[in-house]
Amino acid sequence: MGEWLRNQGHEFGATTGRPRRCGWLDVNVVRHAAMINGLTDLVITKLDILSGLKNIKMCVAYDVDGVRYDYIPSNIEDLYKAKPIYEEFDGWEEDISTMKTYEELPENCKTYLRRIEELCHTRISMISVGPERNCNIYLHEMLK
């Protein structure tokens, strides 16, 4: 799946052309980054590349030797053994790249976005729905 996401999103180094590592969203990493950096808002980019997928996964926890961690394990040995625990979402068929408002987005897309906000304890203020500079949906005035 990582290779597919990388190709869909054109995730290659601008200078070196080296392929970037890609995978499903890990909300534990996002939540931790938001907490330690004092973030109040999130920007979700490249949401459009998920269009057409039947199912979309999101890492919500880790399994370490049968124990569930709802946060990034602080012990490096546990971190190396951690296996992702995923929540799975129904995808959407619609091409969202021309949509201009949150209300236009498919319901399954909105469900996915609401879950990100819920698990990260941080609101989403902007969504990128296409490759062009004007393919953004603003949800809060802060980033306009």
Language-model region placement:
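Non-transmembrane, aqueous-exposed alpha-helical and coiled segments at domain scale
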Residues: 1-144
